């Protein structure tokens, strides 16, 4: 059962209004969404309920919601073609989350790598190890030092879990609700979020098998180039808005001259050859990816252009490319008023709510509460 405006494939994605959105968010996600608008019915959300899984300053959060919506618009997301809305404006998101919480299992969520990263816990793995060792040792009834070590690890892990917020643990279920509410066909995400879309698929299928066909099961779409733009100060880690050093990322609202300085300070690899090789030359490969995606120049062409030249020349040119991109982007950004954004979010919420409420009604009928 689909909404009448939904003849085209439905694409859903969103960005949290927390921290500074950066070049990695733009190249890895938003620029891809812009291209998807032509052939798809796109729904883009400012996921403010996801942002509050960690502490936010209320006044800053308010500003960031508007800022993210402006970034969508300045990037080329067109409210005439796409639905843009604020997650918290539609209560169906949290209602469906509760229903899906009753279908989800703790083990589904313990597997999520983002939870493991943020709490430094891989509880599933430790429990499996303890069980294996205990079974192996049970005949002799001697508890080995290995088991003792694992039990200590288990206690530390449980201590970390007790301190972590429930929202941080459960937000993949909220993400599943975001996606399933809109009969979504495709979810464009970065590699780090692909696992959460897999959970969404699992929960959708589990609900369908328990209560009958209800949800459309979406596909994951990961951009090949630029899916992961790495940190300028450390190419082994993803560019991140919560990085300790400001030299890790280029913010979309950074002054162009500041961004150029960050490029000039970016780490490089040993040797002098400007060549794309993720394993041997991760730093220069990351900079080449940024260059290629911002200019649409193929990687091979860039390699040929800088054959025999040094890192200094290459970084100088890339700094200019980034400067030009940010200057143009920020010019568009500054032209958008807060009032305009509020109106677009309000209109978007009205359109999104019709679809979300229809899905939620179907779900409530299936589980027997209406």
Spans of features found by a protein language model:
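Short amphipathic alpha-helical segments at helix-loop
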Residues: 53, 181, 185-188, 333, ...
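Short, histidine-centered active-site or binding-site loop motifs used for metal coordination
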Residues: 15-17, 48-50, 185-186, 243, ...
């Amino acid at each position: 059962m689909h909404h009448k405006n939904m003849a085209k494939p439905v694409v859903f994605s969103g960005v949290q209004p927390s921290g500074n959105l950066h070049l990695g968010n733009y190249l890895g996600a938003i620029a891809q969404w812009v291209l998807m608008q032509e052939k798809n019915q796109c729904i883009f959300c400012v996921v403010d309920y996801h942002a509050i899984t960690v502490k936010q300053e209320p006044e800053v959060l308010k500003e960031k919601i508007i800022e993210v919506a402006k970034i969508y618009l300045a990037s080329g997301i067109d409210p005439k073609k796409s639905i843009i809305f604020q997650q918290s404006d539609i209560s169906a998101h949290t209602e469906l989350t509760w229903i899906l919480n009753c279908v989800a299992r703790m083990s589904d969520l313990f597997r999520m790598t983002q939870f493991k990263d943020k709490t430094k816990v891989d509880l599933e793995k430790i429990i499996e190890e303890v069980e294996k060792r205990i079974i192996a040792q049970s005949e002799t009834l001697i508890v080995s030092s290995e088991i003792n070590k694992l039990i200590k690890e288990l206690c530390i892990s449980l201590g970390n879990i007790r301190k972590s917020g429930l929202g941080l643990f459960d937000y993949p279920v909220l993400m599943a609700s975001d996606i399933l509410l809109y009969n979504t066909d495709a979810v464009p995400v970065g590699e780090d979020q692909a696992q959460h879309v897999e959970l969404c698929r699992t929960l959708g299928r589990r609900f369908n098998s328990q209560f009958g066909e209800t949800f459309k099961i979406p596909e994951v779409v990961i951009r090949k180039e630029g899916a992961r733009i790495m940190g300028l100060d450390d190419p082994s880690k993803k560019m991140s808005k919560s990085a300790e050093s400001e030299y890790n990322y280029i913010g979309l609202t950074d002054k162009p001259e500041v961004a150029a300085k960050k490029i000039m300070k970016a780490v490089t690899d040993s040797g002098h050859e400007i060549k794309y090789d993720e394993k041997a030359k991760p730093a220069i490969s990351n900079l080449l990816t940024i260059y290629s995606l911002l200019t649409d120049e193929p990687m091979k062409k860039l390699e040929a252009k800088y054959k025999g030249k040094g890192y200094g020349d290459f970084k100088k040119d890339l700094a200019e490319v980034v400067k030009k991109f940010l200057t143009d982007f920020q010019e568009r950004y500054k032209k958008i008023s807060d009032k305009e954004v509020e109106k677009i979010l309000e209109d978007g919420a009205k359109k999104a709510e019709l679809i979300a409420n229809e899905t939620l009604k179907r779900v409530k009928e299936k589980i027997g509460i209406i």
